[in-house]
């Protein structure tokens, strides 16, 4: 009886040891990461669509991804400078700045898509062309919001049209302010306009569009585990082939995600923009 108990206990301990080794092996492989999303919309709205996406990607990669954003775009820029996010979804200008300043490396982007900036006005407005904006207040998300702010302002300046920029912190705030008549016009992009409140969007009209540029980047810190980045990239690229993944992509206005590399944003670098030089130099 004593021998049986000793054998049973030994086998039981071996069994426990096996599972502990397996558990610790899995824990040493699985990692936890924070993915920061540029706050073009409210944190609540972003969380509604991105938290399920990150749960899906966590399941597919075996790693753990948690959602993060910031109260406004300037705060997000400061956190990018500090390298606060392991992975970030950032606008094209942010990427060319923080690739150099904070060592973020792009690995994916929205597939078959260029980012196009817009200027919107009230649909009943008498404003018919860009010249009509001369000497008016125009709403923008932030100074360094690429397609929704930097490109429209550059075009207005090139045409000799003087405006008074008013920064309202997010794309949704721009649309809301224009739809409710607080500003005669504002800058945005197609994806966020399409995702805006349908009833209020009915009050808006697109006055003008920019040319297209390489879209937002998914970029990881260079210090992030290389295999984890590969797992994440693979899971993202496979999403459109999976019914669940396809539905999640649709929630953020994507059809698919494609692989990306640093040189994809050379079209943005060629513009030689400097809106964040002061932030970087501090």
Task: State each model region's role.
Residues 106-129, 217-221:
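Hydrophobic/proline-rich hinge and linker segments of small-molecule sensing/allosteric domains
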Residues 34-39, 46, 131-148:
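Short loop->beta-strand "edge-of-pocket" segments that line small-molecule binding or catalytic clefts
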Residues 25-26:
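N-terminal signal peptide c-region/cleavage motif recognized by signal peptidases
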Residues 2-17:
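Bacterial N-terminal signal peptides that target proteins for export
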Residues 31-94:
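Extracytoplasmic small-molecule ligand-binding "clamshell" domains
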Residues 33-37, 41-52, 219-282:
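An extracytoplasmic/periplasmic, membrane-proximal ligand-sensing/linker region
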């Amino acid at each position: 009886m004593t021998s049986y108990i000793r054998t049973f206990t030994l086998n039981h301990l071996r069994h426990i040891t096996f599972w502990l080794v397996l558990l610790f092996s899995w824990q040493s492989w699985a990692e936890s990461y924070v993915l920061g999303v540029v706050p073009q919309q409210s944190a609540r709205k972003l969380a509604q669509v991105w938290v399920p996406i990150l749960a899906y990607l966590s399941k597919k990669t075996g790693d753990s991804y948690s959602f993060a954003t910031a109260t406004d775009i300037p705060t997000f820029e400061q956190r990018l400078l500090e390298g606060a996010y392991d992975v970030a979804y950032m606008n094209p200008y942010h990427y060319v700045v923080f690739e150099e300043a904070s060592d973020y490396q792009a690995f994916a982007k929205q597939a078959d898509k260029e980012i196009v900036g817009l200027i919107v006005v009230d649909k009943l407005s008498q404003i018919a062309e860009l010249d009509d904006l001369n000497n008016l207040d125009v709403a923008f998300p932030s100074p360094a919001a690429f397609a929704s702010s930097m490109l429209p302002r550059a075009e207005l300046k090139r045409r000799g049209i003087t405006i008074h920029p008013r920064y309202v912190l997010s794309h949704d705030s721009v649309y809301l302010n224009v739809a409710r008549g607080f500003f005669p016009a504002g800058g945005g992009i197609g994806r966020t306009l399409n995702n805006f409140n349908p009833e209020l969007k009915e009050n808006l009209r697109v006055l003008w569009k920019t040319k297209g540029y390489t879209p937002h980047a998914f970029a990881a810190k260079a210090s992030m585990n290389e295999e984890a980045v590969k797992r994440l990239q693979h899971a993202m690229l496979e999403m459109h082939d999976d019914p669940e993944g396809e539905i999640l992509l649709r929630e953020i206005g994507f059809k698919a995600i494609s692989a990306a590399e640093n040189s994809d944003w050379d079209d943005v670098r060629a513009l030689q923009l400097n809106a964040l030089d002061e932030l970087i130099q501090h």
